[in-house]
Amino acid sequence: MGRSLKKGPFIADSLLKKVEKQNTENDKSVIKTWSRSSTILPVMIGHTIAVHNGKAHIPVFITEQMIGHKLGEFAPTRTYRGHLRDKKGAR
């Protein structure tokens, strides 16, 4: 279920300030953030944002198709190592 339209999308204030500052300076350096719940806005297109996954920061390059999604969707928190194989002697 989505967020109410009258409330608007959530974005961390500190993240929005950093993005707007880089837009005014034409700077495209990597922005580190722990705010996985922030919504991707059109202002962020072209920026690389390093999203924390609980262990490390994963760089995410923002494109037009990502608008409206959350930053955490692009930084997986769990590693999938495949299903365990059956042991030969377990019959």
Swiss-Prot record:
GO annotation, biological process: ribosomal small subunit assembly; translation
InterPro entries on file: Ribosomal_uS19, Ribosomal_uS19_bac-type, Ribosomal_uS19_CS, Ribosomal_uS19_SF
SUPFAM superfamilies given in the database record: Ribosomal protein S19
Keywords: Ribonucleoprotein, Ribosomal protein, RNA-binding, rRNA-binding
UniProt-listed Gene3D superfamilies: 30s Ribosomal Protein S19, Chain A
Annotated transmembrane regions: none
GO MF annotation list: rRNA binding; structural constituent of ribosome
GO cellular component: cytoplasm; small ribosomal subunit
Organism domain of life: Bacteria
Role, per record: Protein S19 forms a complex with S13 that binds strongly to the 16S ribosomal RNA.
PANTHER family for the chain: RIBOSOMAL PROTEIN S19P FAMILY MEMBER (PTHR11880), SMALL RIBOSOMAL SUBUNIT PROTEIN US19M (PTHR11880:SF8)
Family designation: Belongs to the universal ribosomal protein uS19 family.
Name of the protein: Small ribosomal subunit protein uS19
Species this chain originates from: Prochlorococcus marinus (strain MIT 9515)
